[in-house]
Amino acid sequence: VAVFGADTDVSPYDSGSYASSTTYITGMAVVKACNELKKQICTIAADLMGCEEDAVEFAGTCVRRIDTQQTVSLTDIAYKAQVNNTVPAETTQTHTSPVSPPPYMVGMVEIELDKLTGKVDILDYMAVVDCGIPINPNLARIQTEGGIVQGIGHTLMENVTYDRNGRPAESSFMQYKVPTRQDMGRLKVEFEHSYEPTGPFGAKSIGEIVINTPGPA
């Protein structure tokens, strides 16, 4: 697998990673690519074992012949794919979706408010997220926590003001305030699983929902 980043000479066109489309859209393209590559691997393995393609099955680290239990490793298949082979072990897949199933999130926050100064301290923040079946629960939790921090910062701290000459007064992070971990109190994130049939392995998006929820909360 060769991944080229930030080189427009060799990278294919991509419209960008935004609008909660990375896991939901790109993930399905990855699923399609893997399924097609698995077919190619089985075709090459069947040729190596001298049988029909429908007589073999993909078994993770190898391909197994169903009737004799003979196996051929992915290492041998990869070598065959590069030497004297007519089946390319590579594929390019795309994916679009006519639907965009929404994720859901509940945010509950306990604050301490100084009625005289208006200062708000976050004591507890509880979030429950339905993003389908999380592909990577740890990363989904981290993204949720990061989004909550961003949302709280956007709501309570971040602001752009201008001086009388029209120049931004916030020229660095010394003036433009963003929250730190000490500003967050206790964060707790739970997931309510639901299976989304149009997403990769039942997943939905999670990007924007975790940032948008803290403001109303």
Where are the predicted features?
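C-terminal catalytic domains of large/alpha subunits in multi-subunit enzymes
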Residues: 2-217
